[in-house]
Amino acid sequence: MMLENKAFEPRPAHSAPTVDKMALTGVNFYYGDAHAIRDVTLSFPERQVSALIGPSGCGKSTLLRILNRIYMLYPKMRATGSVTLDGQNILDPGYSMNELRARVGMVFQKPVPFPMSIYDNIAYGIRHHERISKAEMDVRVEQALRSAALWDEVKDKLKGSGLGLSGGQQQRLCIARAVALRPEVLLLDEPTSALDPISTAKVEELVARLKTDFTIVIVTHNMQQASRISDNTAFMYLGELVEYGPTAEIFQSPKVKRTEDYITGRYG
C-alpha cells in the first residue's frame, strides 16, 4: 500500500543489526478502574530513536511513564505485564527505583528548570546519586551542557538562574540535566510542542546527536518531526498499539489502514 502523500521524507530504515534495550510484553495500564493501555508488546532498539505517535488520549504519554515507573507517584495507577531493561523486568517490585531513575532519564513537554542556578540544575541529580569532587563536578556540568548544545550560550552565567533562560534554552537545560546522570535511555514527552521553530530545530538536531550515546523514545504529535528524527515509529490508538516498525515503512507503506488514515491527516 503506497501512499500518494509525499510530504514526508522519513529517515531510511536502519539496516544494521540491532539489540533491544527495552522491551514491553503484554503491558496493560489502569487509572483506577479505567483500562488505559491494552496488551502492548513492542521493543526499543539500543541507540536508536523510537517515536510514539497517535491522536490525543491514545496512551502515548502513559506508555512513556510506564518505562520509568513515574506513575507510581500517583495513587490508584498500576501496570501489569513485563517491561525489561537489558533483560531485567523493571516492574518487579524489587527493582531499585534509584537505579531506574539513574538509567532512564525523562524530559517533559513543558521545560521545568529547578529554581536554582544553571550549574546547580545540572549538579543536583549528580549529587543525589554520586559523591564526586568539585573539580569532577565542574567537568560533568560542562559535559552535560555541551551534550545539550548549551555550553557556549551559558558558560559565562552558570551562577545565573535557569529560570532566566529562553524557553528553548530551558528545554535544552532540562535535557542536559537528564543526560548529566549518564542514563542509558532518554524519554522525551513532546519536548518541542511549546517551542518556536528555531528552538524546535535545535532540539531535533540535538536528538540526532544524542542517539549515538542513548536509546531515545519520543512522544510527538508532529508527523513531520517523527518522520525526520526517528528510526522506528509506533502508532497508538485508544490505548492499543496499532502498528510498529521502521519509520520509513510506517510512513511510506503502512500495513494497517488506520495508520495510513492517521498519518495522511484523515483524522487526528
From Swiss-Prot:
Superkingdom assignment: Bacteria
GO biological-process terms attached to the record: phosphate ion transmembrane transport
Sorted UniProt keywords: ATP-binding, Cell inner membrane, Cell membrane, Membrane, Nucleotide-binding, Phosphate transport, Translocase, Transport
Gene Ontology CC terms, in alphabetical order: plasma membrane
GO molecular function: ATP binding; ATP hydrolysis activity; ATPase-coupled phosphate ion transmembrane transporter activity
EC number: 7.3.2.1
InterPro entries listed in its UniProt record: AAA+_ATPase, ABC_transporter-like_ATP-bd, ABC_transporter-like_CS, P-loop_NTPase, PstB-like
Domain ABC transporter: 22-263
PROSITE patterns (alphabetical): ABC_TRANSPORTER_1, ABC_TRANSPORTER_2, PSTB
Principal localisation: membrane
Location of this chain's protein in the cell: Cell inner membrane
Swiss-Prot/TrEMBL catalytic activity: phosphate(out) + ATP + H2O = ADP + 2 phosphate(in) + H(+)
Membrane-related topology note: Peripheral membrane protein
Residue numbers binding ATP: 54-61
SUBUNIT field: The complex is composed of two ATP-binding proteins (PstB), two transmembrane proteins (PstC and PstA) and a solute-binding protein (PstS).
UniProt record similarity statement: Belongs to the ABC transporter superfamily. Phosphate importer (TC 3.A.1.7) family.
NCBIfam families, per database record: 3a0107s01c2
Role according to the record: Part of the ABC transporter complex PstSACB involved in phosphate import. Responsible for energy coupling to the transport system.
Name by which UniProt lists this protein: Phosphate import ATP-binding protein PstB 2
Lineage summary: Bacteria, Pseudomonadati, Pseudomonadota, Alphaproteobacteria, Hyphomicrobiales
